[in-house]
């Protein structure tokens, strides 16, 4: 707990938590929201296409969206870290935080498997997608819904945050 208290008292943490600057908490939260919307939105679009929605859209060109998702995830990781250190004693002592992290980790593993096994197939648009591709798409959607739900529940379950 001493480390969490120290982390919460660093200059960056105090600035994120206490600054009246628009560049502090509001901008970081905005970036976190945009990053999340991009990662999950693009990933969900790919998942839905794999599940058979919009069959006229070829799957193979969607591989170009993976770098967009990774950049958005990087923004999310950085902004999430800033939000986390601003309220470390609350968030890092909440079991819901760890549930969220597990769902994110599972979603990222799923995304990697999708990229390797589905988009790695040179005949991806030549026939129906495999049942395994569809399973990866469904589990991806489940993992992202779980991560988002856990993230929202952090505001309502567990220790009460001192942050806005």
Task: Annotate each language-model stretch with its function.
Residues 1-164:
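Polytopic transmembrane helical bundles with strong interfacial aromatic enrichment
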């Amino acid at each position: 707990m001493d480390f969490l208290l120290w982390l919460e008292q660093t200059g960056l943490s105090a600035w994120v938590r206490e600054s009246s600057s628009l560049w502090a908490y509001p901008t970081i939260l905005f970036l976190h929201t945009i990053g999340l919307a991009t990662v999950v939105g693009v990933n969900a679009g790919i998942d839905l296409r794999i599940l058979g929605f919009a069959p006229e859209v070829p799957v193979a060109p969607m591989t170009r969206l993976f770098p967009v998702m990774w950049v958005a995830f990087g923004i999310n990781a950085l902004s999430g870290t800033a939000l986390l250190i601003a309220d470390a004693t609350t968030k890092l002592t909440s079991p819901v935080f760890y549930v969220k992290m597990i769902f994110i980790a599972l979603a990222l593993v799923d995304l990697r498997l999708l990229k390797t096994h589905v988009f790695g197939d040179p005949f991806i648009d030549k026939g129906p997608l495999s049942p395994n591709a569809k399973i990866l798409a469904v589990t991806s959607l489940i993992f992202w819904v779980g991560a988002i739900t856990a993230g929202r529940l952090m505001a309502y379950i567990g220790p009460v945050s001192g942050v806005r």
